[in-house]
Amino acid sequence: MNQYVIAIDQGTTSSRAIVFDHAGNIVSTGQMEHEQIFPQAGWVEHNPAEIWNNTREVIGSALSKANLTRHDIAAVGITNQRETAVVWDKNTGEAVYNAIVWQDTRTQSIVDELAQDGGPERFKQKVGLPLATYFSGTKIKWILDNVDGARERAEAGDLLFGNTDAWVLWNLTGGVDGGVHVTDVTNASRTLFMDLETLQWDQEILDIFGVPASMMPAIKSSSEVYGHVHTSQLLRETPVAGILGDQQAATFGQAAFQPGEAKNTYGTGCFLIFNTGEEIVHSKNGLLTTLGYKLGDAKPHYALEGSIAVTGSLIQWLRDNLGMISSAPEVEELAAGVRDNGGVYIVPAFSGLFAPYWRADARGAIVGLTRFANKGHIARAALEATAFQTREVLDAVNADSGVPLTELKVDGGMVANEALMQFQADILGVPVVRPKVVETTALGAAYAAGLAVGFWKDLGELSANWNEDKRWEPQLPAEEQERQLRLWKKAVTKSMDWVDEDVK
């Protein structure tokens, strides 16, 4: 009966449920967008109740489209936007504040305060991450410090924290009626609180942040049965057996299981993950050290990650804020109407610059404008910004690993854009490879869940599912590639040193 696995993909802009068959093919999908809440400049929030309601809806939608019931589903996997922090009351099931999203920069003052003693890399050796607004830890502290009564309730043991994986899991397994409060190692590695070696919360760091340990979910592997769906839900009694943060899930879905393998996901942001195997590699080039995956009792696999805050969301900004396009695919048509970028470069530092710079004082800049520049040049510069940022991250990966990547596996929504993929190959100087199933994030979560219940027997079986769809070879002459890179790097410097006491 159990011929399928369902993955819940709780992303930055939408929540989806995708049903996969044994060959890793998509059977059906349910998807709902949720509201992006911007209370003030630099603040980004989601409504946790809306996310949970949408999750329930999309599960129903995916099942009904394929005419399936819970009896057809072997296991549930969860993947999620990482670092987005939810704090809720375990007695009522209600969030005490909106989810603070990974792009949110309101916690910069907390980062600055904590960095006074030991600098931004104060905890990096232990947790693999620099102090930055990006990670969950500063967001939890902000909620405890700023929401009336939150600290007292947390210290009394009434509040729970989770990234959205833990929020969805807790609700799926019963919520106030016995909900399981668990996260996996990949999500835990994005909080600033997990020791990379012990895979446990670090009490000393929790104390420094003023976060009670009672709030934190238990840390489990990425592939094991955490609990079963509550009897009040459509999927009742189905095991929930896989959790991976979205970028780690995409790496797993790309079958990048071996050291030296890597993928780049093109979504709201861009995230390049390079598998370092069982070795913890500390970056000297602005990358994060993170968990790749941990399967049950097996040893964990670690990874280096280059996180880019703004790529796909730059196209959304052209659509929603500027009204330059009415749908995201239009950007490719506009860009195709011009021969090159017309000397225009966009540095989309809306949340500062992430890897490899980690500059919170940067803000977005469009440089090289002349009267010659038109909408097509702006559209092309927006697409090229994604490729340039990826090149800088790949350079950092090559420097840290000492082993230059020979090709880049890609996935995510933007890989449908063929002009971007060709330019990406041109600016990297290595082939870019797209798999047949580009929903690798959901697929990775499905794989983790399916492995735990024996739906798939081993990693070899998963690797056999991976198939190439298309490959782009670099075509740009080396000297032109270098000229464009120099201009890009010059543009990046123009975005820095913007935020100071005059900038509200």
Swiss-Prot record:
**A GO cellular-component term linked to this record:** cytosol
**Residue numbers binding ADP:** T12, R16, T268, G312, G413, N417
Q: Kindly list the residue ranges recorded as spanning the membrane.
A: none
Highest taxon of the lineage: Bacteria
Q: Please list the GO biological process terms of this entry.
A: glycerol catabolic process; glycerol metabolic process; glycerol-3-phosphate metabolic process
The family classification in the record reads: Belongs to the FGGY kinase family.
Indicate what this protein is called per its UniProt record. Glycerol kinase
**Annotated organism of origin:** Paenarthrobacter aurescens (strain TC1)
**Organism ancestry:** Bacteria, Bacillati, Actinomycetota, Actinomycetes, Micrococcales
